Amino acid sequence: MAKRVYAPDCHIIVESGLMDCSPVEVPRSVGDLRFMAHCGCIWPNVRFVGFEINEYLHKANRLIAFIGGAQIDPYGNVNSTSIGDYHHPKTRFTGSGGANGIATYSNTIIMMQHEKRRFMNKIDYVTSPGWIDGPGGRERLGLPGDVGPQLVVTDKGILKFDEKTKRMYLAAYYPTSSPEDVLENTGFDLDVSKAVELEAPDPAVIKLIREEIDPGQAFIQVPTEAK
């Protein structure tokens, strides 16, 4: 959508080794053939793409990365590895893939469903480092301190991180949600005092998403009344 609506000159890089992609429809996974449409380059060392590409672009300070996960804590540390004890997990996921390298070297935008079981004060495993435990946390672990999580985008609103404390706060909520709704679905104390209501999306953009970008409704479900 970014390339179609407001950032036509952006370059999409995928952790599976694909660079400068221009998919017509939204891909279902990082290995989806849709990503190869008009793809500019296939990186040869796919196993290390998460670190090699991101380390290079970190030096150029030109990368914004997107990641997801099963759990997130107040400082933007993300778990996409397992639920429960690491050696005897209740559930094992496919992470990290390239997510650790991405979160290490990039400014990230984290996308998640907003549920109390996902927004936890302490996550079961740190797959992708955020601001660790606050100011100086990344530097203490030898991670670049000039990059880190910038936004958390959920189905209820947009959250940011305080510049001084590095702790998450609610910046904006959708017309279909409210600060109270966000708090009810968050498993830790969250500052909502700065939150503003976002405007409803442009109908033309909604039409573009439903009819051209995601016509198969892989990610965006069309309400029955809108069909």
Q: What is the predicted function of each stretch?
A:
Residues 24-208:
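Conserved phosphate- and dinucleotide-binding cores of soluble alpha/beta proteins
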